[in-house]
């Protein structure tokens, strides 16, 4: 899928340059996990494919936010994004503590 919009500047840096090993404001483990997740997002054709990795706890945030998905990066922080399966696009990609 194509990532069309990114809200968090740290994640945007990783989207633009996936070979980065460090980003200001993220520790090495967070950086590595986010890069892995971004790679999976790019190659997926359906967000249900992300559920193949149980530690990411991939799930849609419905009924409150239909179409918005969440992946667990750390105990409190999630990579969240909207998916348009027909257009094969991911938008409003963010790194947030929504709890």
Annotate each PLM feature.
Residues 31-51:
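Generic amphipathic, hydrophobic interface segment in small proteins and small subunits
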Residues 3, 26-33, 53, 65, ...:
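Generic, well-ordered alpha-helical segments
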Residues 7, 30, 34-37, 57, ...:
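Amphipathic alpha-helical interface surfaces
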Residues 2, 22, 46, 57, ...:
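Glycine-rich, flexible loop/turn motifs
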Residues 59-62, 68-99:
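Enriched for short, Lys/Arg-rich terminal
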Residues 45-69:
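A short, surface-exposed loop/turn module that caps and links secondary-structure elements
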Residues 1-38:
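Arg/Lys-rich, positively charged N-terminal/basic patches that mediate binding to nucleic acids
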């Amino acid at each position: 899928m194509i990532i069309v919009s990114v809200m968090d500047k740290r994640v945007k840096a990783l989207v633009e340059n996936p070979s980065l090993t460090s980003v200001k404001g993220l520790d090495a483990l967070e950086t590595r996990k986010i890069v892995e997740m971004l790679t999976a997002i790019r190659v997926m054709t359906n967000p249900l494919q992300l559920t193949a990795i149980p530690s990411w706890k991939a799930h849609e945030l419905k009924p409150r936010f239909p179409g918005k998905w969440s992946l667990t990066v750390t105990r409190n922080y999630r990579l969240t994004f909207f998916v348009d399966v027909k257009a094969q696009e991911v938008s409003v990609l963010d790194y947030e503590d929504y709890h």
